[in-house]
Curated annotation (Swiss-Prot):
NCBIfam families membership: atpD
Translocase is among the record's keywords: yes
BP terms from Gene Ontology: proton motive force-driven mitochondrial ATP synthesis
Name of the featured protein: ATP synthase subunit beta, chloroplastic
Record carries keyword Acetylation: no
Subunit structure and binding partners: F-type ATPases have 2 components, CF(1) - the catalytic core - and CF(0) - the membrane proton channel. CF(1) has five subunits: alpha(3), beta(3), gamma(1), delta(1), epsilon(1). CF(0) has four main subunits: a(1), b(1), b'(1) and c(9-12).
Pfam families: ATP-synt_ab (PF00006), ATP-synt_ab_N (PF02874), ATP-synt_VA_C (PF22919)
Chief site of localization: plastid
């Protein structure tokens, strides 16, 4: 991280010393540039091409050096379209890697891979910038204590808890509530942990990025009146961008998150949507650079590239970066090298189910498919572990009985199984929860449920103390006291209607 000088004398001296080269070859987003002998830029240095094309249009393209070819030539990958570039154009070596603005000025704004604002809200203070290529924290700086990152979302905290400074994979198709879950997590980390979030849109649809921005403004995650009060910074490198931008936009978002962790000493949530597109962009760049492809056509450096990104996402003694990464699984093949490499880094998985969404149970997190390495008695305690296991057993038994119920009906079940089904249906409904960010759509106030309250509620359902309550009393409530109060209201309503 560096504080940039504002005086003009240092700027003049920099321009006097600038290192200039010329484009010798252009193949799509890849440029070859020749420099004077002894003036070669380093790997990862940013190069800038400025000028005018044949139609007189202004050109400003930033590239990143990827290979030193010999004979004073380097090969660089462009971060924006190379339309209008010609051989012989002048290229300036900036002498440093790409640097992006960091700190509070980034909140509520949308950036591209170069750290330039793209939301038409004016310039951003660039006095404090940080290079996107940095080493992972040293072992001695890491916080190795295993601790739960409480989200206030019942189904997550009980059955697939997140690790503070961990990495979580978010699996789900279109329209099952990924965006709403992401926004609720952004809202809750700001309220409960005083933290901020950074959202990295890597290679996804521009329309989805725009929808997310609009929904964030609507739900108050981005504060339009006072932009500094916003809880999230957005960095987009969408599907229409060249592979260089899609490959590096994840690092831009991570660099902004690292500043909040290391300098502001905050807990940070880093969202990457979609981690598969990061790998896909790396594969495209690898082919353009002429590297021999590996399994299924992926880049030979797949594990290294993934590790370089993932190892920077961690807890230090100053703060933590907890990362939630949407994972696209190509052709639903979990053995594909891209998702398989991602799985090696994940501490928990949150799987969203279309079946639950169809039932109207939101968040539609699948309680049986979602997993977490944190769900161990020595980490979460016996009470939490036992409750979670019993909830899963009850739901699993209900799942097994569903075929029998569909064919023969509930009456054919044994007394014990009927009780299990009744409790499982209550558990299923109690796993739903009203969200703060959905208040504008549903009209019901959002609820943050602490972990101890969550465990107490499920223990009461499992113990049979609440067997007499109707199952609709458990739907879309916060803690168990709200469910019992709702049951009393339902009873009073039914009595008054008689």
């Amino acid at each position: 991280m560096k504080i940039n000088p504002t005086n003009s004398s240092s700027l003049t001296s920099t321009l006097e010393k600038k290192n200039l080269g010329n484009i010798t070859q252009i193949i799509g987003p890849v440029l070859d540039v020749a420099f004077p002998p002894g003036k070669m830029p380093n790997i990862y240095n940013a190069l800038v091409v400025k000028g005018r094309d044949t139609a007189g249009q202004q050109i400003n393209v930033t590239c990143e050096v990827q290979q030193l070819l010999g004979n004073n030539r380097v090969r660089a990958v462009a971060m924006s379209a190379t339309d209008g570039l010609t051989r012989g154009m002048e290229v300036m070596d900036t002498g440093a890697p790409l640097s992006v603005p960091v700190g509070g000025t980034t909140l509520g704004r949308i950036f591209n891979v170069l750290g330039e604002p793209v939301d038409n809200l004016g310039p951003v203070d660039t006095r404090t910038t940080s290079p996107i290529h940095r080493s992972a924290p040293a072992f001695i700086q890491l916080d190795t204590k295993l601790s739960i990152f409480e989200t206030g979302i019942k189904v997550v905290d009980l059955l697939a808890p997140y690790r503070r400074g961990g990495k979580i994979g978010l699996f789900g198709g279109a329209g099952v509530g990924k965006t709403v879950l992401i926004m609720e997590l952004i809202n809750n980390i700001a309220k409960a942990h005083g933290g901020v979030s950074v959202f990295g849109g890597v290679g996804e649809r521009t329309r989805e990025g725009n929808d997310l921005y609009m929904e964030m403004k609507e739900s108050g995650v981005i504060n339009e009146e006072n932009i500094a009060e916003s809880k999230v910074a957005l960095v987009y490198g969408q599907m229409n961008e060249p592979p260089g931008a899609r490959m590096r936009v994840g690092l831009t978002a991570l660099t902004m998150a690292e500043y909040f962790r290391d300098v502001n000493e905050q807990d940070v949530l880093l969202f990457i949507d979609n981690i598969f597109r990061f790998v896909q962009a790396g594969s495209e760049v690898s082919a353009l650079l002429g590297r021999m492809p590996s399994a299924v056509g992926y880049q030979p450096t797949l594990s290294t590239e993934m590790g370089t990104l993932q190892e920077r996402i961690t807890s230090t003694k100053e703060g933590s970066i907890t990362s939630i990464q949407a994972v696209y699984v190509p052709a639903d093949d979990l053995t594909d090298p891209a998702p398989a490499t991602t799985f090696a880094h994940l501490d928990a998985t949150t799987v969203l189910s279309r079946g639950l969404a169809a039932k109207g149970i939101y968040p539609a997190v699948d309680p049986l498919d979602s997993t977490s390495t944190m769900l161990q008695p020595r980490i979460v305690g016996e009470d939490h572990y036992e409750t979670a296991q019993k909830v899963k057993q009850t739901l699993q038994r209900y799942k097994e009985l569903q075929d029998i119920i569909a064919i023969l009906g509930l009456d054919e079940l044994s007394e014990e199984d009927r009780l299990t089904v009744a409790r499982a249906r209550k558990i299923e409904r109690f796993l739903s929860q009203p969200f703060f960010v959905a208040e504008v759509f549903t009209g019901s106030p959002g609820k943050y449920v602490g972990l101890s309250e969550t465990i107490r509620g499920f223990r009461l359902i499992l113990s049979g103390e609440l067997d007499s309550l109707p199952e609709q009393a458990f739907y879309l409530v916060g803690n168990i006291d709200e469910a019992t109060a709702k049951a009393m209201n339902l009873e009073m309503e039914s009595n008054s209607n008689k």
